[in-house]
């Protein structure tokens, strides 16, 4: 019974998803909005239970860790922190989707997939066994594959979903192949037991092969270059609320899995994978920012921006000090609020363009669609401004504080050159973020000019995301402390 209680947040999500799926069958499309509110309530309940368990873990000290179900699941500060990241994204997406799924015939399927995807991500965060880790990865991936192609009549959406599915399937095969090499060398799939037998991997060519395969497998989900090929098309083609879930939530699943597998299980091979992540971090952040400059689709620009942000988080693997790991972990939460909010703001603009049937209907998220947004939809423009400035690292936002912790710890570790590259990339990103702000506030609107009321679900989701960005920026101490406790699971202080 005690083990079940530790999984209460996950069970709440599954129960909510099943209730939504069964209830939706008996509701008319016009009555299905209630399902969005039910999904929101279920997510809020899961957040409450996760926060409560996080408090119990940290009350007794920094090193408290519980393992359940024959030590296949670990309940610790790292798992609970990432569960909060996933649930925060699910909350924002669930609220915004109340408008997106309005009058849809498939509302119940949509919310069930969102909640089941979040459930899979949360299991990945706690996975203490390679087999369970892979199964949870696939559960979340299958749900997001379906969500990416949710608009079956949209050719761009189907193209992005197909690329996501094909490349995702290949990456899953590579990941499973890498995990099998680790099992073959160590004789176990338990992450703690693998860590306790470092001699079985060091000096063994199988260990190097496993690192390469696992980097490719996890790199796909983290959208690290050159494993990013799916991301721009999928983020642009998917419904904006789904893009928010993928960029802000699903990507973090790859990071928490990599934290456990590389830093804990494969600690003996640190010199090898540390070099790989250093190279990937530099290439990813630079490529993402440079290509984002040339984009005219805002969602595609945000996709390449997500590559750059992944490069910043990957710096934690390159530096490998406790503070740098805490900075990378904190950045995942900051990025969740910033990126989810930015995609929801884009969703509001896409709704405005498609409902008015004006502008570029083929690419409704084109930069021209954002012309004069400050006058036409002031709240969406203001929130988008907060998000892009936070992504650029402008104070007093979550992005600034997370970058400050991560970059300063990189300098303290003696890797000043890496910090300089990251700072220059942040400066470059300010160009395309500022260009978007210019379009919203300093360029006249195309077509209609009258003010548009933003739908309540979009407004509520935006305000939740803005609150997260500003609270983390203005009051960072508790978030830094929680991130430090999570980092202690990986590297003892």
Swiss-Prot record:
Annotated catalysed reactions: methanophenazine + reduced coenzyme F420-(gamma-L-Glu)(n) = dihydromethanophenazine + oxidized coenzyme F420-(gamma-L-Glu)(n) + H(+)
A GO term, aspect molecular function: Methanosarcina-phenazine hydrogenase activity
Coiled coil (UniProt feature): none
Enzyme Commission numbers on file: 1.5.98.3
Keyword Transport tagged: yes
Quaternary structure and partners: The FPO complex is composed of at least 13 different subunits. FpoA, FpoH, FpoJ, FpoK, FpoL, FpoM and FpoN proteins constitute the membrane sector of the complex.
Principal location class: membrane
Name the UniProt record assigns to this protein: F(420)H(2) dehydrogenase subunit N
UniProt GO cellular component terms: plasma membrane
Entry similarity comment: Belongs to the complex I subunit 2 family.
């Amino acid at each position: 019974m005690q083990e079940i209680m530790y999984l209460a947040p996950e069970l709440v999500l599954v129960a909510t998803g099943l209730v939504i799926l069964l209830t939706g069958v008996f509701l008319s499309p016009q009555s299905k909005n209630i399902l969005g509110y039910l999904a929101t309530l279920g997510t809020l309940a899961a957040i409450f239970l996760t926060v409560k368990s996080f408090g119990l873990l940290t009350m007794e000290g920094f090193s408290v860790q519980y393992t359940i179900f024959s030590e296949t699941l670990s309940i610790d500060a790292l798992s609970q922190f990432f569960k909060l990241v996933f649930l925060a994204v699910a909350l924002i997406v669930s609220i915004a989707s109340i408008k997106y799924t309005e009058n849809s015939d498939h509302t119940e399927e949509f919310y069930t997939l969102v909640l089941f995807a979040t459930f899979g991500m949360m299991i990945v965060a706690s996975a203490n066994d390679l087999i369970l880790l892979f199964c949870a990865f696939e559960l979340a991936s299958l749900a997001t594959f379906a969500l990416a192609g949710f608009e079956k009549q949209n050719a761009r959406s189907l193209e992005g979903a197909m690329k996501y599915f094909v490349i995702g399937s290949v990456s899953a095969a590579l990941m499973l192949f890498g995990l099998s090499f680790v099992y073959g060398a160590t004789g176990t799939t338990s992450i703690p037991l693998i860590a306790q037998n470092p001699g079985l991997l060091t000096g063994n060519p199988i260990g190097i092969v496993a690192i390469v395969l696992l980097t490719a497998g996890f790199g796909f989900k983290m959208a690290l270059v050159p494993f990013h090929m799916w991301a721009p098309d999928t983020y642009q083609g998917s419904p904006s609320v789904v893009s928010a879930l993928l960029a802000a939530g699903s990507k973090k699943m790859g990071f928490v899995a990599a934290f456990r597998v590389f830093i804990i299980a494969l600690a003996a091979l640190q010199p090898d994978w540390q070099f790989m992540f250093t190279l990937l971090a530099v290439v990813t952040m630079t490529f993402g920012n440079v290509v984002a400059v040339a984009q005219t689709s805002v969602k595609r620009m945000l996709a390449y921006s997500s590559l750059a942000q992944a490069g910043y988080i990957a710096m934690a693997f390159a530096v490998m000090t406790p503070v740098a790991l805490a900075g990378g972990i904190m950045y995942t939460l900051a990025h969740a609020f910033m990126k989810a909010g930015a995609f929801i703001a884009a969703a509001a603009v896409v709704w405005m363009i498609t409902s008015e049937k004006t502008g570029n209907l083929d690419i409704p998220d084109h930069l021209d669609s954002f012309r004069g947004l400050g006058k036409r939809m002031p709240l969406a423009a203001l929130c988008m401004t907060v998000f892009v400035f936070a992504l650029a690292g402008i104070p007093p936002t979550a992005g600034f504080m997370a970058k400050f912790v991560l970059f300063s710890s990189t300098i303290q570790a003696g890797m000043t050159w890496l910090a300089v590259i990251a700072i220059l990339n942040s400066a470059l990103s300010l160009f395309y973020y500022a260009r978007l702000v210019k379009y919203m506030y300093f360029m006249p609107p195309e077509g209609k000019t009258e003010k548009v009321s933003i739908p309540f679900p979009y407004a509520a989701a935006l305000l939740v995301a803005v609150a997260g960005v500003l609270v983390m920026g203005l009051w960072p101490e508790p978030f830094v402390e929680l991130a430090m406790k999570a980092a202690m699971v990986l590297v003892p202080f």
